[in-house]
Protein backbone atom coordinates (compact mmCIF):
# COMPACT_ATOMS: atom_id res chain seq x y z
CA UNK A 1 0.00 0.00 0.00
CA UNK A 2 2.86 2.34 0.85
CA UNK A 3 4.50 1.64 -2.49
CA UNK A 4 1.25 2.47 -4.28
CA UNK A 5 0.91 5.81 -2.44
CA UNK A 6 4.53 6.76 -3.18
CA UNK A 7 3.96 6.07 -6.91
CA UNK A 8 0.82 8.25 -6.87
CA UNK A 9 2.83 11.00 -5.13
CA UNK A 10 5.62 10.77 -7.73
CA UNK A 11 3.06 10.84 -10.55
CA UNK A 12 1.42 13.93 -9.05
CA UNK A 13 4.78 15.72 -8.71
CA UNK A 14 5.73 14.93 -12.32
CA UNK A 15 2.31 16.10 -13.55
CA UNK A 16 2.61 19.38 -11.65
CA UNK A 17 6.17 19.90 -12.93
CA UNK A 18 5.07 19.20 -16.53
CA UNK A 19 2.17 21.65 -16.17
CA UNK A 20 4.61 24.25 -14.80
CA UNK A 21 6.92 23.80 -17.82
CA UNK A 22 4.00 24.09 -20.23
CA UNK A 23 2.85 27.23 -18.39
CA UNK A 24 6.32 28.79 -18.64
CA UNK A 25 6.43 28.08 -22.37
CA UNK A 26 2.98 29.57 -22.91
CA UNK A 27 3.95 32.64 -20.85
CA UNK A 28 6.90 33.28 -23.18
CA UNK A 29 4.68 32.72 -26.22
CA UNK A 30 2.01 35.15 -25.00
CA UNK A 31 4.69 37.69 -24.09
CA UNK A 32 6.02 37.61 -27.66
CA UNK A 33 2.51 37.79 -29.12
CA UNK A 34 2.05 41.24 -27.54
CA UNK A 35 5.20 42.61 -29.23
CA UNK A 36 5.45 43.99 -32.73
CA UNK A 37 7.11 41.76 -35.34
CA UNK A 38 10.90 41.95 -35.55
CA UNK A 39 11.27 40.64 -39.07
CA UNK A 40 11.20 42.83 -42.16
CA UNK A 41 9.55 41.54 -45.35
CA UNK A 42 12.79 42.22 -47.21
CA UNK A 43 12.13 42.80 -50.89
CA UNK A 44 9.05 44.89 -50.14
CA UNK A 45 10.16 46.61 -46.93
CA UNK A 46 13.62 47.98 -46.17
CA UNK A 47 15.10 49.79 -43.21
CA UNK A 48 16.35 53.30 -43.88
CA UNK A 49 20.15 53.10 -43.54
CA UNK A 50 21.79 55.31 -40.93
CA UNK A 51 23.77 58.42 -41.82
CA UNK A 52 27.09 56.63 -41.39
CA UNK A 53 26.14 53.53 -43.37
CA UNK A 54 28.95 52.46 -45.72
CA UNK A 55 27.57 50.89 -48.87
CA UNK A 56 28.76 50.81 -52.48
CA UNK A 57 31.21 53.53 -53.50
CA UNK A 58 30.11 56.16 -56.02
CA UNK A 59 32.80 57.56 -58.36
CA UNK A 60 32.79 60.84 -60.31
CA UNK A 61 35.15 60.50 -63.26
CA UNK A 62 35.49 64.25 -63.98
CA UNK A 63 36.72 65.12 -60.48
CA UNK A 64 39.46 62.47 -60.28
CA UNK A 65 43.05 63.77 -60.63
CA UNK A 66 44.68 60.28 -60.67
CA UNK A 67 46.64 60.94 -57.49
CA UNK A 68 46.23 57.30 -56.36
CA UNK A 69 45.74 58.26 -52.72
CA UNK A 70 42.79 55.85 -52.64
CA UNK A 71 45.08 52.96 -53.59
CA UNK A 72 47.66 53.89 -50.94
CA UNK A 73 45.16 54.17 -48.06
CA UNK A 74 43.22 51.03 -49.00
CA UNK A 75 44.20 48.19 -46.63
CA UNK A 76 44.11 45.72 -49.53
CA UNK A 77 45.29 48.04 -52.38
CA UNK A 78 42.02 47.44 -54.19
CA UNK A 79 41.22 50.39 -56.51
CA UNK A 80 42.75 50.05 -59.97
CA UNK A 81 43.71 53.44 -61.42
CA UNK A 82 44.92 53.56 -65.04
CA UNK A 83 46.21 56.92 -66.20
CA UNK A 84 48.55 58.43 -68.76
CA UNK A 85 50.62 61.58 -68.61
CA UNK A 86 49.39 64.31 -70.96
CA UNK A 87 52.45 66.30 -72.10
CA UNK A 88 50.39 69.21 -73.45
CA UNK A 89 48.53 69.78 -70.18
CA UNK A 90 51.50 68.56 -68.09
CA UNK A 91 49.36 66.45 -65.80
CA UNK A 92 47.91 62.97 -65.41
CA UNK A 93 44.73 62.04 -67.25
CA UNK A 94 42.56 59.23 -65.96
CA UNK A 95 41.84 56.44 -68.43
CA UNK A 96 40.12 53.84 -66.28
CA UNK A 97 39.09 53.36 -62.63
CA UNK A 98 37.65 50.19 -61.10
CA UNK A 99 36.97 48.53 -57.76
CA UNK A 100 36.14 44.86 -57.18
CA UNK A 101 33.35 44.90 -54.59
CA UNK A 102 33.71 41.15 -54.09
CA UNK A 103 37.02 41.90 -52.34
CA UNK A 104 36.25 45.37 -50.90
CA UNK A 105 35.84 45.48 -47.11
CA UNK A 106 33.82 48.75 -47.24
CA UNK A 107 36.11 50.58 -44.82
CA UNK A 108 35.62 53.83 -46.80
CA UNK A 109 39.25 54.94 -46.32
CA UNK A 110 39.37 55.83 -50.01
CA UNK A 111 36.36 58.13 -49.57
CA UNK A 112 37.77 59.76 -46.46
CA UNK A 113 41.22 60.55 -47.89
CA UNK A 114 40.26 61.52 -51.46
CA UNK A 115 41.48 65.13 -51.94
CA UNK A 116 38.92 66.00 -54.64
CA UNK A 117 35.90 64.19 -53.14
CA UNK A 118 35.36 62.21 -56.33
CA UNK A 119 34.52 59.17 -54.20
CA UNK A 120 31.47 58.99 -51.96
CA UNK A 121 29.61 56.27 -50.11
CA UNK A 122 26.06 55.35 -51.13
CA UNK A 123 23.41 53.47 -49.20
CA UNK A 124 23.32 50.62 -51.73
CA UNK A 125 24.06 47.24 -50.19
CA UNK A 126 22.35 44.87 -52.63
CA UNK A 127 25.35 43.69 -54.62
CA UNK A 128 24.38 40.05 -55.07
CA UNK A 129 25.13 38.55 -58.49
CA UNK A 130 25.43 35.05 -59.94
CA UNK A 131 28.97 35.54 -61.24
CA UNK A 132 31.53 37.14 -58.92
CA UNK A 133 33.29 38.80 -61.86
CA UNK A 134 30.25 41.07 -62.20
CA UNK A 135 31.22 42.65 -58.86
CA UNK A 136 34.22 44.30 -60.54
CA UNK A 137 32.70 47.74 -61.16
CA UNK A 138 34.36 50.11 -63.63
CA UNK A 139 34.05 53.90 -63.66
CA UNK A 140 30.77 53.77 -65.62
CA UNK A 141 29.08 51.32 -63.23
CA UNK A 142 30.37 53.21 -60.19
CA UNK A 143 29.09 56.48 -61.64
CA UNK A 144 25.46 55.38 -61.45
CA UNK A 145 23.63 56.58 -58.35
CA UNK A 146 21.34 53.98 -56.75
CA UNK A 147 17.70 54.51 -55.77
CA UNK A 148 17.30 55.77 -52.25
CA UNK A 149 15.14 53.54 -50.10
CA UNK A 150 12.81 56.46 -49.39
CA UNK A 151 12.36 57.26 -53.10
CA UNK A 152 11.93 53.74 -54.48
CA UNK A 153 8.25 53.32 -55.47
CA UNK A 154 8.36 49.53 -55.10
CA UNK A 155 9.58 49.54 -51.49
CA UNK A 156 7.97 50.57 -48.21
CA UNK A 157 10.68 52.19 -46.06
CA UNK A 158 10.66 51.08 -42.44
CA UNK A 159 11.01 54.23 -40.41
CA UNK A 160 12.25 52.93 -37.08
CA UNK A 161 12.95 49.89 -34.97
CA UNK A 162 9.48 49.83 -33.40
CA UNK A 163 10.19 46.61 -31.54
CA UNK A 164 13.01 48.06 -29.42
CA UNK A 165 12.10 49.06 -25.88
CA UNK A 166 11.78 52.73 -24.99
CA UNK A 167 15.12 54.48 -24.47
CA UNK A 168 17.28 52.02 -26.40
CA UNK A 169 18.06 54.51 -29.16
CA UNK A 170 19.04 57.33 -26.80
CA UNK A 171 22.63 58.00 -25.72
CA UNK A 172 23.96 55.98 -22.81
CA UNK A 173 24.31 57.90 -19.56
CA UNK A 174 24.20 61.30 -21.25
CA UNK A 175 22.67 64.27 -19.46
CA UNK A 176 19.34 65.43 -20.94
CA UNK A 177 20.59 68.61 -22.70
CA UNK A 178 23.46 66.76 -24.43
CA UNK A 179 23.11 66.42 -28.19
CA UNK A 180 23.00 62.94 -29.67
CA UNK A 181 25.34 62.10 -32.56
CA UNK A 182 23.39 61.61 -35.79
CA UNK A 183 19.63 61.54 -36.26
CA UNK A 184 16.97 59.04 -35.34
CA UNK A 185 15.31 57.32 -38.31
CA UNK A 186 11.94 58.98 -37.61
CA UNK A 187 13.63 62.42 -37.75
CA UNK A 188 15.18 61.57 -41.13
CA UNK A 189 11.78 60.61 -42.52
CA UNK A 190 10.25 63.87 -41.23
CA UNK A 191 12.86 65.90 -43.11
CA UNK A 192 12.13 63.98 -46.33
CA UNK A 193 8.40 64.79 -46.24
UniProtKB/Swiss-Prot annotation:
It catalyses: a plastoquinone + NADH + (n+1) H(+)(in) = a plastoquinol + NAD(+) + n H(+)(out); a plastoquinone + NADPH + (n+1) H(+)(in) = a plastoquinol + NADP(+) + n H(+)(out). [4Fe-4S] cluster 1 binds at residues 64, 67, 70, 114. Its EC number is 7.1.1.-. Its cofactor is [4Fe-4S] cluster. It is found in: Cellular thylakoid membrane. [4Fe-4S] cluster 2 binds at residues 74, 104, 107, 110. GO terms for cellular component: plasma membrane-derived thylakoid membrane. GO terms for biological process: photosynthesis, light reaction. SUPFAM superfamilies: 4Fe-4S ferredoxins (SSF54862). Binds 2 [4Fe-4S] clusters per subunit. It is a peripheral membrane protein. InterPro entries: 4Fe4S_Fe-S-bd (IPR017896), 4Fe4S_Fe_S_CS (IPR017900), NADH_quinone_OxRdtase_chainI (IPR010226), NDHI (IPR004497). Disulfide bonds: none annotated. GO terms for molecular function: 4 iron, 4 sulfur cluster binding; iron ion binding; NADH dehydrogenase (ubiquinone) activity; quinone binding. Pfam families: Fer4_7. NDH-1 is composed of at least 11 different subunits. Belongs to the complex I 23 kDa subunit family. NDH-1 shuttles electrons from an unknown electron donor, via FMN and iron-sulfur (Fe-S) centers, to quinones in the respiratory and/or the photosynthetic chain. The immediate electron acceptor for the enzyme in this species is believed to be plastoquinone. Couples the redox reaction to proton translocation, and thus conserves the redox energy in a proton gradient. This is NAD(P)H-quinone oxidoreductase subunit I.
Amino acid sequence: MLKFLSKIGDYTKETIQSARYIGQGLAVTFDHMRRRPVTVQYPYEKLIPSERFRGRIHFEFDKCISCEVCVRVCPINLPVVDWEFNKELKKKQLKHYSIDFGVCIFCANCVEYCPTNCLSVTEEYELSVYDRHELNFDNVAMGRLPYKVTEDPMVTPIREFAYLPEGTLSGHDLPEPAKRAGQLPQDIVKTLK
